[in-house]
């Protein structure tokens, strides 16, 4: 059972929890919206951590996304220092923030599926008459 999860994935999960808390309660940047940390991928050598995030309700506004990216980039040093205090690692990875497109892509796919279902229903309804 212990071999199922790699060390880097366990570290990524821990960093995700800590980052979510730190961003919500300790980062005091007015540019920062309601950020959700979706995933943290840590390199095998712990040299860097890729943090994938979304912003609640602002997926379609590029200027808001750019402001959030700038706020997170400016808070990297603070977040890394606080993570080093909370998570006991010999080396704390460098943080790289990326906006997570998967939520936007998922909602777009869901809309396309709903549209296809409606089209099928209207076609089937016309054929029955």
Swiss-Prot record:
Superkingdom field:
Bacteria
Q: What GO molecular function terms would the record report? A: ribosomal small subunit binding
The record's listing under SUPFAM superfamilies reads:
Ribosome-binding factor A, RbfA (SSF89919)
Compartment list: Cytoplasm
GO CC annotations, alphabetized: cytosol
State the Pfam families in the record. Answer: RBFA (PF02033)
Gene3D superfamilies, alphabetically?
3.30.300.20
Q: What is its main location?
A: cytoplasm
Q: Name one GO biological process term.
A: maturation of SSU-rRNA
State the family it belongs to: Belongs to the RbfA family.
Concerning NCBIfam families, the annotation shows: rbfA
Q: How does it assemble?
A: Monomer. Binds 30S ribosomal subunits, but not 50S ribosomal subunits or 70S ribosomes.
**Protein name as annotated:** Ribosome-binding factor A
Origin organism is: Marinomonas sp. (strain MWYL1)
Q: Cite the source lineage.
A: Bacteria, Pseudomonadati, Pseudomonadota, Gammaproteobacteria, Oceanospirillales
Q: Which gene encodes it?
A: rbfA
């Amino acid at each position: 059972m212990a071999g199922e999860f790699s060390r880097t994935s366990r570290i990524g999960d821990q960093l995700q929890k800590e980052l979510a808390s730190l961003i919500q309660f300790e980062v005091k940047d007015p540019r920062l919206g309601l950020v959700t940390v979706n995933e943290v991928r840590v390199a095998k050598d712990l040299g860097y951590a890729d943090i994938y995030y979304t912003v609640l309700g602002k997926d379609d506004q590029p200027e808001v996304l750019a402001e959030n990216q700038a706020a997170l980039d400016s808070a990297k040093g603070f977040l890394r220092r606080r993570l080093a205090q909370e998570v006991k690692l010999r080396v704390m990875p460098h943080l790289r923030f990326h906006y997570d497109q998967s939520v936007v892509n998922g909602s777009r796919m869901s809309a396309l599926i709903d549209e296809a279902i409606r089209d099928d229903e209207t076609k089937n309804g016309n054929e029955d008459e």
